Amino acid sequence: MDDVRSVLLIAALSNAVKHKSVPAAGAVMGAILGTHPELRSKAGEIKGLLGSVLEEVSSLSAEDREEKLKTIAPDQYASLFEKKEKKKIGLPDLPKAEGGVVMRFAPNPSGPLHLGHARAAFLNDEYIRRYGGKYILRIEDTDPKRVDPDAYDMVREDIAWMGLSIAETIFQSDRFSKYYEVGKELIQKGHAYVCRCDNEKFKDLKMHKTACPCRSQSPEEALDLFDQMLDGAFTEGEVGVRLKTDLSHPDPAMRDYPLFRVLTSTPHQRVDAIVYPLMNLSVAVDDHLLGMTHVIRGKDHIANTKRQEFIFRYMGWETPVYRHYGRMGIEGVVLSTSQMRAGIQSGEYSGWDDVRLGTLRAMARRGIQPQAVRNAVVEIGIGETDIQFSWENLYAKNKEIIDSQADRFFFVPDPVLVPVSGSDPVVAKAMRYPGDESRGYREIPFAGSLYLPKAELESGAAYIRLKDLFNIKVLYEGDIIRGEYAGDDLQEARSKKAPIIQWLPENHANPCTLKTPDGDVSGVCEPEAVTTQDRIVQFERVGFARIDAAGNPAVAYFTHR
């Protein structure tokens, strides 16, 4: 447990130095389990060590705490004293970016892209636009267990929807020979070896900072074994290639991590291979060979960055400039690809664009504009602080884009047909867009009976203003509801604080289903609203909607209010 104790010691010293006091047990424990999720299963053992560590740190003077932290974890010490930059509008400048950048968006084709992917995609795209250069789409498909064949096309479609400035598309599955070349070079230089230890044995040695017997191989022996791997001499799980790192590194995950594995149980549809590169090897190789100048990704990749830097140093390559942004919590939608797929297969979700999902195609089907998503994630920026994604902010930005384009129409949810007496037939004229007569008027004919929202009637409203028409009294006679004309005066309705509601005549009502995250809403709408598919409209008193299926009956997807 020495390595765990060293991690505890760093966390306790950091807490004490940051707050200029003795370390707080709860904060130290939370920091450990938050930054080292692999230790959560050992929480009980950690608590047993925590007391002695806290006692040791508490016994030190403030100066000694700083000195000790500076010695054993200089990066952690430095991060505590970094000056916080004043918040700027827009994204911060990137170092070494003048003259152009080469950047990449690198999704795994396990399913369609979602809002989390959009953050990385748009942030990189913004910097390409700012500095000029080359934006590469790199499909990271080296793990056949995580590849959905249909996702290749879905990713392309999502990229097109976002409007990214992609200059070149690369498939990692086309580049295995390049990974093998670098793997052999690392072995020849004595930086990698072929490990035949079973996983449990190696894990035990690693946790004790002890080299496995395979580590002492000569480059010639290791190369011969690697060639045997490529020739199919080993079975899955029997052997792998590991990078020689630092066995005394405080983070066990950094110690001699794997570069290649044998995989035969899951064939890859694009490559006939037995030996597969692991992510840190393929990413490092491609970031170098493709000339990446800057890499922007989530801080959950900080450990991967450190792993990849070993490869860059061993190969004598110049490392890109790395920036890591904080986690973005997204509530209210499903983002897990496996959970989405299971829901689709069970019939819980209608498809990858079901409105309850957080995929970009679900956003598009609802009428969310790609520019609105771009604006929202750029505003969030690339800071390392974890944030909560604001749907209201996204909706506000989307409204800025679609509001002026969206004609207004009536949609009556859960319609109840109500006869209205006392008025001659009349044609109501309602503006297509408030305050803009140049857009014209809708004509809605009234001739005796009309549809009203069930919710308004269930509230027991006795006096109602029919928007753009007239006032009515509502009479409830057992199960029968009827209306009586009560004049045209809008001011009278306002003085009575009467609800002003949407309505539709029986002969001018197009059946329409409004799909929302809370379920389908049956209703009727103006026929003019649903003449064109993919149109964005605003249903008055309901919200914006995208027309998904035009005609009679119609289907609309709720966007937001």
Curated annotation (Swiss-Prot):
It holds the Pfam family tRNA-synt_1c_C. Coiled coil: none annotated. One of its GO terms (biological process) is glutamyl-tRNA aminoacylation. It catalyses: tRNA(Glu) + L-glutamate + ATP = L-glutamyl-tRNA(Glu) + AMP + diphosphate. Transmembrane segments: none annotated. GO terms for molecular function: ATP binding; glutamate-tRNA ligase activity. A motif ('HIGH' region) lies at residues 107-117. It is found in: Cytoplasm. The keyword rRNA processing does not apply. Keywords: Aminoacyl-tRNA synthetase, ATP-binding, Cytoplasm, Ligase, Nucleotide-binding, Protein biosynthesis. Its main location: cytoplasm. PROSITE patterns: AA_TRNA_LIGASE_I. One of its GO terms (cellular component) is protein-containing complex. Its EC number is 6.1.1.17. InterPro entries: aa-tRNA-synth_I_CS, Gln/Glu-tRNA_Ligase, Glu-tRNA-synth_arc/euk, Glu/Gln-tRNA-synth, Glu/Gln-tRNA-synth_Ib_cat-dom, Glu/Gln-tRNA-synth_Ib_codon-bd, Rbsml_bL25/Gln-tRNA_synth_N, Ribosomal_bL25/Gln-tRNA_synth. Catalyzes the attachment of glutamate to tRNA(Glu) in a two-step reaction: glutamate is first activated by ATP to form Glu-AMP and then transferred to the acceptor end of tRNA(Glu). Belongs to the class-I aminoacyl-tRNA synthetase family. Glutamate--tRNA ligase type 2 subfamily. This is Glutamate--tRNA ligase. It comes from Methanospirillum hungatei JF-1 (strain ATCC 27890 / DSM 864 / NBRC 100397 / JF-1). The gene is gltX.
